[in-house]
Amino acid sequence: MKIGNVQLKNDLILAPMANYTDAGMRYLASVYGAGLTVTEMVSAKGLCFNNPNTAALLETRERGNCPVAVQLFGADPEYIKKAVEHPLLKDFDIIDINMGCPVAKVVKNGEGSALLRNPDLVYKVVKAAVSATNRPVTVKIRAGFENDEITAPEIAKVIEEAGGAAVAVHARTREQFYSGNADWNVIKKVKESVGIPVVGNGDVEKRDDYLRMKETTGCDGVMVGRAALGMPFIFAKLQDKEYEFDVKAAIMKHIEILGEYLPERTVINQMKAQLCFYAKNTRHAKDVRRAISELKTRDDLMRIIDEFF
């Protein structure tokens, strides 16, 4: 799959997920076969004002063996343009813009999925990003805002007209958040509406899902999100490739990478959520969740890993 001038080794993409797609998770996903990984969403305005918490989201030292996209969110074209030009983004291969986040505090600012109701602003935001870089600019959207507002095909056309290189479609509405089923027919309609690559997202958990999404929608790529949490090897499974997965070794590598650029306290907090997902397919899942509630120090973290993994 090719996005603009960036060639991917396959059509599988790790979805951006706030608080989860840190450098450790992105590295492991790349090792197990992801063709592209994407950062957690980063505030364009925060980047412009050099928010100290933003730099950690942009770590690329352990990028793995595939291209990496940075995902920005914002609704002000000027801030988007300045963010794209920021030196901290120089090592990213693709610029992605979030137009799908359903969280209330983002939506109330007119950002994320709120943009699905404002095609004129969508055009201006994408155009601003495209004008600021030679790299491909992509956009992640949802099916629509409310369940009776399926605007993805219209928004995708606007993105293409503004110079967007690809569009990823989470086939749920903002109203759904992450509940109910993804409507893959929306992905098909988007694919029929534009000439740029379309990436499908939603309810892909096994190889059969991956193959069916490709066949029924005609999408060019498939983005995997929650199904990859604690299971970076899903990218090998979806491609029907052999793999070996040592969960303890994966956790330790994850911690090692985070420790290269984050303070110990932040590493511990970051790993609390990650450990729950690493444990979800083990017989110790409940014990791990209970132990995490009392996790305070690195020694506690190591004890949990040694005891349950």
Tell where the protein language model's regions lie, with residue ranges.
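Hydrophobic alpha-helical membrane-association signature
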Residues: N118-V125, A250-I251, M271
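N-terminal small/glycine-rich loop or linker at the start of catalytic domains
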Residues: M1-I13, K45-V68, C101, V106-N109, ...
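Hydrophobic faces of well-ordered beta-strands that scaffold small-molecule active sites
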Residues: L12-P16, T37-T39, V68-L72, I95, ...
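Glycine-rich, positively charged N-terminal anion/phosphate-binding segment
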Residues: M1-K2, M17-D93
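Alpha/beta catalytic cores of nucleotide-metabolism and tRNA/nucleoside-modifying enzymes
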Residues: L8, A18, G24, A132-N134, ...
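Alpha/beta enzyme core
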Residues: K81-E111, D120-I196
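Active-site beta-loop-alpha junctions enriched in small/polar residues
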Residues: M17-N19, V42-A44, F73-A75, G100-P102, ...
